[in-house]
A protein has these predicted regions:
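Hydrophobic core residues within well-ordered beta-strands of beta-rich domains
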Residues: 11, 63-65, 81, 95, ...
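Solvent-exposed strand-loop boundary residues in beta-sheet-rich modules
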Residues: 105-107, 123
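Hydrophobic beta-sheet segments that form the core/acyl-binding groove
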Residues: 68-104
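Short hydrophobic alpha-helix segments
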Residues: 113-115, 131
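A structural signal for beta-strand boundary/capping segments at domain termini and interdomain linkers
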Residues: 108-109, 127
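Conserved GNAT-family N-acetyltransferase fold
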Residues: 37, 99, 113
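Hot-dog-fold acyl-thioester-processing enzymes
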Residues: 2-64, 121-163
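Generic short beta-strand
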Residues: 19, 99-101, 117
């Protein structure tokens, strides 16, 4: 990643809504929003050195501790989807990321996903610090993203507001 690319939200490869992902309402089923967010996060993890190549070495991996998805607009079969990731915060063991899912052609925001990831030592299956090289990349990305606007949906809590 170049310094210029660091300052913008991280762009993931475009994806297309597949036929098998459409439910009886005729739109992308809620579970597949998670699939798209998860598979797109793999691209960011690969660039940070904590993706599949790292995980299959058996030393460490990233687990999801919490995720919150907001469904804002429909996606239909065949729609191309663009997903971006923004680092909201990070420390030695945790990575707090926020994703925006857009209809690639029409540009509207279809969904957001806020996620807390924890780095895990696969031998002990306990939280452990990121590898040093990855930690440096995460810190650089977090610093570059610090100037981005905080997403409107970040930090939301589920509940019914009572008067």
């Amino acid at each position: 990643m170049t310094d210029t690319a660091l300052a913008a939200p991280f762009e993931c490869p475009l994806r297309t809504v597949e036929h098998e992902w459409v439910d009886y309402n005729g739109h992308l089923n809620m579970a597949y929003y998670h699939v798209l967010f998860d598979q797109s996060l793999d691209k960011l993890f690969n660039d940070l050195g904590i993706g599949w190549d790292y995980t299959k070495q058996g030393e460490g991996s990233c687990f999801t501790a919490e995720v919150h998805v907001c469904y804002l607009d429909e996606l239909l079969e065949g729609d191309e989807v663009r997903i971006t990731y923004q680092v909201l915060d990070a420390d030695a063991k945790r990575l707090h990321v926020f994703a925006h899912m857009y209809h690639a052609e029409k540009g509207y925001l279809a969904a957001t996903s806020e996620q807390m990831c924890i780095h895990v030592d696969m031998k002990t299956r306990r939280a452990a610090p990121f590898p040093e090289a990855s930690q440096k990349k995460i810190e650089a990305l977090a610093k570059a993203h610090a100037g981005l606007a905080r997403p409107e949906q970040a930090g939301r809590v589920i509940g019914i507001k009572r008067k």
